[in-house]
Curated annotation (Swiss-Prot):
Family (UniProt): Belongs to the VapA/VapI family.
PANTHER family per UniProt: ANTITOXIN HIGA-1
The species this protein was found in: Dichelobacter nodosus (Bacteroides nodosus)
Gene Ontology molecular-function annotations: DNA binding
UniProt protein name: Virulence-associated protein A'
SMART domains listed in its UniProt record: HTH_XRE (SM00530)
PROSITE patterns xrefs: HTH_CROC1 (PS50943)
Lineage start: Bacteria, Pseudomonadati, Pseudomonadota, Gammaproteobacteria, Cardiobacteriales
DNA-binding region: 27-46
Coiled-coil stretches noted in the UniProt entry, renumbered to this chain: none
Domain (HTH cro/C1-type) ranges: 16-70
Length: 115
């Protein structure tokens, strides 16, 4: 079984905003430290722009307790939550792996028939 996902994970920009607020750093200072424009950082913080690989790398250098994969994973979870519900009703199963029932008999899960 796949791990459970957050139904509506927050945009990673909210975490950045929270961290900056906690540190008493404004957007202008943070943008300079990250070597990005204030507008670009503001768009991320306000959820209007996603975190790219380059930004993830910069954030991991600025917030040394994180790595780029952390920031990209947050963005991926957010992105998946945004498209998941839109696609769920429009896509049909093409293949599903077989599994064994309680008696060790192989069952095709998509057809619920014993092979």
């Amino acid at each position: 079984m796949a791990p459970q996902r957050m139904k509506n994970p927050p945009h990673p920009g909210l975490l950045i905003k929270s961290d900056l607020d906690g540190l008493g750093i404004n957007i202008t200072e943070a943008a300079k430290a990250l070597d990005v424009t204030r507008a670009a950082l503001s768009e991320i913080i306000n959820g209007k722009r996603g975190i790219s690989a380059k930004m993830a790398w910069k954030l991991s250098k600025a917030f040394t307790n994180s790595d780029p994969e952390f920031w990209l994973a947050l963005q991926a979870k957010y992105d998946l939550s945004q498209v998941g519900e839109q696609c769920a009703d429009k896509v049909r199963v093409l293949w599903q792996p077989s599994s064994l029932d309680n008696e060790g008999i192989e069952v095709n899960s998509s057809e619920n028939k014993v092979k």
